[in-house]
């Protein structure tokens, strides 16, 4: 299975759905666009940007449970695309495989520094040319999310325009 990396988290310009872009790291560099929920998009963007909350969210909690059990996430495998839904599994260091939503699996991979691979068959069907993907970014790993959070921390009502009356 070819390895991919999270290229960006954002909003699909055509559908306004939150998406994660998985980019093939070798070969044609195809992009797999995975629709995700708002919470998973924010968690993925924060992980991509290296932003940590004061208290652990669900994904950090799962990582802590794995560590406490003496296990390590080795890789995330996106193995199937069925009825427009991507299916993934978490591969642990002891050979255990755990069924997972792809959105949760990607966030865990980002937080726990695990590889992400996508089945050739999935890439063949869902992989698109990078030049055809238009996404408004939430996070690209370039510090955008952290800069936005800093702005929100210091923003006052005067920083915003009055709403039209």
Where do the protein language model's features map onto the residues?
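Divalent-cation
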Residues: 1-165
């Amino acid at each position: 299975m070819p390895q991919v990396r999270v290229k960006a988290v954002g909003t699909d310009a055509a559908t306004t759905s939150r998406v994660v872009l998985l980019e093939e790291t070798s070969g044609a560099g195809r992009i797999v666009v995975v629709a995700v929920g708002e919470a998973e998009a924010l968690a993925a963007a924060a992980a991509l940007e290296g932003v940590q909350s004061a208290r652990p969210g669900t994904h950090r909690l799962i990582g802590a449970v794995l560590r406490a059990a003496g296990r390590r996430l080795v890789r995330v495998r996106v193995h199937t695309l069925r009825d427009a839904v991507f299916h993934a599994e978490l591969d642990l260091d002891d050979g255990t495989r755990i069924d997972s939503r792809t959105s949760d699996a990607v966030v865990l991979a980002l937080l726990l520094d695990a590889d992400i691979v996508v089945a050739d068959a999935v890439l063949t069907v869902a992989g698109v040319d990078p030049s055809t993907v238009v996404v408004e970014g939430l996070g690209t790993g370039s510090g955008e999310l952290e800069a936005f959070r800093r702005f929100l921390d210091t923003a006052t009502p005067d920083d915003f325009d009055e709403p039209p009356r």
